[in-house]
Amino acid sequence: MDKYIVNGRIGEGAHGIVLRGIDKSSMKVVAMKRIALKNINEQGLPNSAVRELLALRLIRHDYVANLVDYFSQGYSLVLVCEYLPIDLNEFLRANVKPLAISHVKSYMWMLASAVEYIHSLHIMHRDLKPANLLIGFRGELKVTDFGLCRVFRNPELVGSTNAEKDQQLFTHQVASRWYRAPELLYGSRTYGPEVDLWAIGCIFGEMLKNSPLFPGENDIGQLCTVIQVLGTPDEEIWPGVSSLPDFHKISFTSTKKQVSFNEILTEVDESSRIMLERFLRYCPKSRITAQEVLEAAYFQQEPLMTPLNDLPLPIEKPLNTATAEFANWDWSATHF
């Protein structure tokens, strides 16, 4: 089914190439994620592709880049989603100064709304970062790229008699380093949706500061940057930390906070710094939840959120539209 015209490359990541296309029937612009399927006859669809497809089919939210269509093409799975012209990372880099607090509040509200809904479906995103947050032509922010998502069990439905047996095991090699929660850096395989809240806190701080909050060069360096601000974790502030797989493999001299958020965010109001601290806590269970974010008094305090219609509009980035790149692509599609 020759339904789409491909007219440019948006980007490329670990999970596939993202192209800009046009739906011939509606003439709407769409984003098309092409995921290569290796050895499909022997192994079937990769788990990551299945999870992303199932999640996108389930999720319908104003602040998620929703799935429009999907189909197989040769040895590829193509996910067709609504098109948004720029991501938050590009948007922030294009601004010399940090965003206005009222703008930051609006983006945080939209992000928390999306994540609260995603978590209500018992799905962890596990790769929240500015590059996976898109900004649309109306100024709205939407979550994208569910390539690392996983379903987590409802804690209320998990029995307590065989707690160890009931635990889900996940890989800790998820999330981009600068947004990776401490439990992941220490090798935890039994984490939960709190990893997304840590990532949101890092994104929040980056919007306030206009540069990454914890820019570590490697995993150990990442822990160092966090420890400089939060101090060395111990059992008192993070019960169970000493039992994490890599805790004793990485030794740090016990230290208190060396740099405070007041020093990092010198021109940020106190209420924003207090709100940020609620995300960036070592103990996962002490972190604010997405639902609590939406209920926080922070959003009712001055300055109030900028209305959607008054948010800055993105400038669409130039695309790679070299025709030779797409000349030999057969986009006749077989729908599942």
Walk through the language-model features, giving the residues of each.
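Conserved short submotifs of the Hanks-type protein kinase catalytic core
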Residues: 75-87
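Activation segment signature within eukaryotic-like protein kinase domains
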Residues: 107-108
